[in-house]
Amino acid sequence: MSDFNKDDYLNDLPDADELANGQASPDADGADAPSDTGEQLKDDMLKDAAAEQSAGEQASEESAKAAAEATADAASDGDAEGSSLTPLGQAKKEAAEYLEALQRERAEFINYRNRTKKDMDRARQQGIIDVLTAMLPGLDDIDRIREHGEMDDSFKAVAAKIDKTFEKFGVEKFGLKGEDFDPTKHEAILHKPDPEASKATVDTVVEAGYRIGDRVIRAARVVVASPQN
């Protein structure tokens, strides 16, 4: 049996530094390989995502830049057109714009004035119609008194003033015995056969009609003499 040599045994043992650096065991290198591969894949995925994000941001910046350039070009064209005019040309252009605006305002004012006048005339006419309508029963009574000859001179003067007042405001009285019957202005309350009549005529005016211009306020209520069949 050989003698045990302490120094030789100690020299054959690996150093602590070699164990820390992984040089003592070859199996340690094989165990670290899968971990390095996973880290590499993770790094590649992060790089690809960063590249895609950068490409999207670059495309957005390019679109915004193109839109800004288009707006600037349009403004530049307008400024160029204005700057190309001489002072006299610029003054003429402004004068034409002011004239156009003035003409437009004048047309609007004329339309407003005409519309206001029509509204005032319509309101005035409606006021006359309201007064006439309220006085119709009294006017009918005056006509009945005239027909029966029971009106004295003083009352005749008052009645004449009333008639003239309505005439002043455009009120026209119509409905006379013997005139042709017109359903647009006559209201027939009775038809009386007449062997001598060749067409329908007004035989008796029960209540006179009134109109303003072409507008009939009240149709004349009449008895109509009609031809016999």
From Swiss-Prot:
Q: Which family does it belong to?
A: Belongs to the GrpE family.
According to UniProt, the name of this protein is Protein GrpE
What's the subunit arrangement here?
Homodimer.
Basic and acidic residues bias spans: 39-50
User: Where are the compositionally biased (Low complexity) regions?
Assistant: 24-36, 65-84
GO cellular component terms, semicolon-separated: cytoplasm
Purpose: Participates actively in the response to hyperosmotic and heat shock by preventing the aggregation of stress-denatured proteins, in association with DnaK and GrpE. It is the nucleotide exchange factor for DnaK and may function as a thermosensor. Unfolded proteins bind initially to DnaJ; upon interaction with the DnaJ-bound protein, DnaK hydrolyzes its bound ATP, resulting in the formation of a stable complex. GrpE releases ADP from DnaK; ATP binding to DnaK triggers the release of the substrate protein, thus completing the reaction cycle.
Q: Which domain of life does the UniProt lineage start with? A: Bacteria
HAMAP family per UniProt? GrpE
What keywords would UniProt list here? Chaperone, Cytoplasm, Stress response
NCBIfam families referenced in this protein's UniProt entry, alphabetically: PRK14157.1
Q: What is its main location?
A: cytoplasm
| Keyword Cell cycle recorded | no
Q: Which organism is it from?
A: Bifidobacterium animalis subsp. lactis (strain AD011)
| Disordered, as annotated region | 1-89
Q: Name one GO molecular function term.
A: protein-folding chaperone binding
- Gene, per the UniProt record: grpE
| Record carries keyword Chaperone | yes
Biological process (GO) annotations held by this record are: protein folding
Report the subcellular localization.
Answer: Cytoplasm
